[in-house]
Amino acid sequence: NPSENSYGNDQSYNSNISVDIMKKYTEALNYLLGSNKHKAVLDDMTIVFWAMEPEETCEDLFSQLIWSQADQMNAEDTEAMLKKLVEDANAGYLTEQRLASMEEIHPDVDFYMLGLKPNSSRLSVKFLIRRKYADVLWNIARFQRELQITREVKPVYLSWIKKELISPKSKNDKVNPALMARQFEAMIYGCDYPNALLETMVRRVRIDSGRKKMNDVRIGVIKACLNRKNVGEEIKVALDKENTNQAYLCGRLFAILERLQQEASNYSLNRTVKDAYFASASTRPLLVFPKLINLANQSYLKKAQYPMFYNKLIGEVMVKLNGGFPDHFSLKEQGEFIVGYYQQNQAFYEKKNQEDREDERYGTGK
């Protein structure tokens, strides 16, 4: 069509970008793609990032907090830095003094993130984000704070999250690229995580078996998704005995009943109530819990070494449940059940570890 051929130019020569500019941006992109300081790969999407300043400190910290691939920071430096950032996120702000102390980082520097995906013979741009570095760092600190599930602050990397979205038995290590892109944007912008992230992680916990069923990363992601949606009802880092959420309480109760069963059998069981009932208890509690309570009263409590301790724990939770169980749990409530279960279990392990340390200290251990 002659009307589309401006000044007699056609195809790529009929463009609002000159050949000179094309060569320059191609050279710049190739430099970014060739530098590990400016690039990270998330499945089949490549993310390049850069700050509008000559020093590469911003990129280094960004890489270390999300991908663990910085040149200038080791694991100890990262954990120390993350602890300070999480403290600021807990307080609800990120101080300029903190940024100023971070190796001469300037909070007003423009920071760019570009998501690229190969598409046939071309590159497809998934996103282009430009933000002040202080805003980026604040949202990463918030992201890391929400993922913490123990009092010991440790960084959680995107590659770890991606791994936990996949069944350990699966030979396919691919995750929906749209899900990973939306998760990345939620981290950078501070908006809600995609519903598919919570749905996938809850499904993995319910369906998978063995030790890989639950871990800090999976439970941390579930907690993070819930807390961004539950305005004014935040799930804490560790066990919260004051939490009266019905699903959270049912999760705690399930952990107590499982622990009671294990103690009643002197920890000799290869299969516990978790293996038999966890999936159904987290979705249809009314169908499962009356049966488990009867088992506890008729068998487990009679054989346990400390029946009064468990009877007291069960009673404390049952009082807050008003003696009844919901008929079913929504996806959100299934997540709350899982976190309640995990945190109650962690509290048991922490108590056991503390007792073991005291036995060693006073020479009373076996």
Predicted segments, located by residue:
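Extended alpha-helical scaffolding segments
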Residues: 1-366
